[in-house]
Amino acid sequence: MINNLTDYNIDLEEIHHIHKLDIPSGTAITLAEDVIENSNYDSWELAPSDDPKKLDINAKRQDNVCGTHKVNYNSINDQISLTHIAHNREGFGLGAVIAAEWIIGKKGVFTMNDILNLK
């Protein structure tokens, strides 16, 4: 729905613990790819980018943060944001168990979209 509103600029934010090695995270890259697929952006770049066709990913590393991902839609009138904040790592463990149970007896390469039957 919002992808048709061209008055909005989109950016992504992610925050993880200081020991996380990849920047941006795989989740941020997947979110960026989904936004790009459904918008006028051509690619993503670590913020700040001066290219209006590149989606900014603002990646931060801080102490005692499990994980935060945020998609912002900004216009001159308002900002709409969708945020996921992991308060602990239990959800990540549960996701790993669900994926392990799902993959029993299957061969190939899969993503969470397959496990969740999204595409």
Tell me the role of every PLM-derived stretch:
Residues M1-L5:
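Rossmann-like dinucleotide/flavin-binding elements
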Residues T6-K119:
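C-terminal substrate-binding/catalytic lobe of Rossmann-fold NAD(P)-dependent oxidoreductases
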